Amino acid sequence: ARRWALMHEYREAAEPEPHLDALLARLGEADLVLVEGFKHEAHDKIEVCREGSRREPLYPGDRSVVAVASDRPLPDANRPVLDLNDTQVIADFICRHCSLAERVA
C-alpha cells in the first residue's frame, strides 16, 4: 500500500499550532483522515481515557466526542465505550461512524 503522512516538529515553544482546517487543506482527496490532538477543534473525536489518568475527561461536556476508548468501564459515558486494547473494535466503529463499512467489507 502507498501512504503519505504530514508531520511537523515545533522548533520553538512559542510557535503557534496551526488550525486543523489549514492542515487538511494540504491533503488531497481522502476517504478518511485520522487526527491526533486538536481536541478543541470542532470535529468528531474518540477520547482515550486510561485507568489512573489524572486528566479530566472531555466527553462529559464535549458533544463532539462520539465515543470513548477506555481500559475500564464507564457506565455514565452516554456514548459508546470501546475497549482501548481491541483495535479491531475501534476500527469497526470508525468505519461505521464514517459510513465506510460498506467500502471495506
Model-predicted regions and their roles:
Residues G61-A105:
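Conserved NTP phosphate-binding and transfer environment spanning the P-loop NTPase/kinase superfamily
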Residues V33-V35, I46-R50, S64-D71:
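Short, hydrophobic beta-strand segments that form beta-sheet elements in well-ordered domains
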Residues A1-I46, P80, A91, A101-A105:
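ATP-dependent carboxylate-amine ligase catalytic core
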Residues H40-G61:
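Conserved C-terminal guanine-recognition region of P-loop GTPase G domains, centered on the G4
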Residues L23-E29, R55-S70:
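Short, Lys/Arg-enriched charge-dense amphipathic segments
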